[in-house]
Amino acid sequence: MRKKFVAGNWKMNKDLLGAVSLATEILQLLGDEAPTCEVAIAPTFLCQQAVFQVIDESAIKLAAQNCFYEDQGAYTGEISAAMLRNSGCEYVILGHSERRQYFNETDEIVNKKVKNALSVELDVIMCVGETLEQRESGVTKSVVETQVRGGLKDLTAEDMKSVVIAYEPVWAIGTGKTATPEQAQEVHAFIRGIVKDMFGEEVANELRIQYGGSVKTSNAKELFGMPDIDGGLIGGASLNAEDFVEIIKSAE
């Protein structure tokens, strides 16, 4: 039985005080009883340590929104997976559509980042998904398959124990549009089939696949009820503590 996983991607939102306040409120609303699903939050790099101080020793795990594919060196402005791991991070989000769109990240770059993160025992949430134009052109599956195979290239079955895939249809991110549970389930099942082909049935059955794309309190329970949807990568709704906690409870 796969354990549901809800992660909040705060993107470039919340200054230091705002991040600490939001993390504190989420903890308070969750209460003393640990959630039955796994939970992580990904603040900006600047707020990582302050947020870690708030959630340390709680059930909430610290995640990062990106990393570079080298451990150290003359890479101005970059943060390495090793630095994140040494600062208390347990997860890193890689290949998010906004990274692909605004920073020209390719599947090859995502793959290098995935490998580097895994090499320092930092678990990965690898994002894949199609644009509206690609969906309307009927190439959703070929786009997603290329991203999955490219991002997971040269990984082992053992590596896959530390990988989560997030399916995020680009046309549903921050637009208010959401894939129907049936649309999302179809792609999630397809992704699981690709992973089965690459790594075998056991790895595919154990892989958690999150859905990301305008997940809200009103649709979370129905989405998470689909057989191949194992939680969510939450954007805008994760910036509101009450909404985020309600979504977490939808996954329990």
UniProtKB/Swiss-Prot annotation:
What is its quaternary makeup? Answer: Homodimer.
Enzyme class, first EC level, given as a word: isomerase
Supply the CDD domains for this chain: TIM
Q: Which NCBIfam families match?
A: tim (TIGR00419)
Pathway in which the depicted protein is active:
Carbohydrate biosynthesis; gluconeogenesis; Carbohydrate degradation; glycolysis; D-glyceraldehyde 3-phosphate from glycerone phosphate: step 1/1
The UniProt catalytic activity note for this protein reads: D-glyceraldehyde 3-phosphate = dihydroxyacetone phosphate
Task: Provide GO CC annotations from the record.
Answer: cytosol
Say what the protein does: Involved in the gluconeogenesis. Catalyzes stereospecifically the conversion of dihydroxyacetone phosphate (DHAP) to D-glyceraldehyde-3-phosphate (G3P).
Q: What is this protein called?
A: Triosephosphate isomerase
Which residues are annotated as active site? H96 (electrophile), E168 (proton acceptor)
- Family per similarity comment: Belongs to the triosephosphate isomerase family.
Task: Give yes or no: UniProt keyword Zinc-finger.
Answer: no
Q: Tell me the PANTHER family matching this sequence.
A: TRIOSEPHOSPHATE ISOMERASE
Q: Which GO terms describe its biological process?
A: gluconeogenesis; glyceraldehyde-3-phosphate biosynthetic process; glycerol catabolic process; glycolytic process
> What is the gene called?
tpiA
Q: Which EC number applies?
A: 5.3.1.1
Q: Which domain of life is it from?
A: Bacteria
* Binding positions for substrate per the UniProt entry: N9, W10, K11, G174, S214, G235, G236
Any single Pfam family the record assigns to this protein: TIM
Instruction: Please provide the record's keywords in A-Z order.
Output: Cytoplasm, Gluconeogenesis, Glycolysis, Isomerase
| Entry's localization field | Cytoplasm
Instruction: Provide a Gene Ontology MF annotation, just one.
Output: triose-phosphate isomerase activity
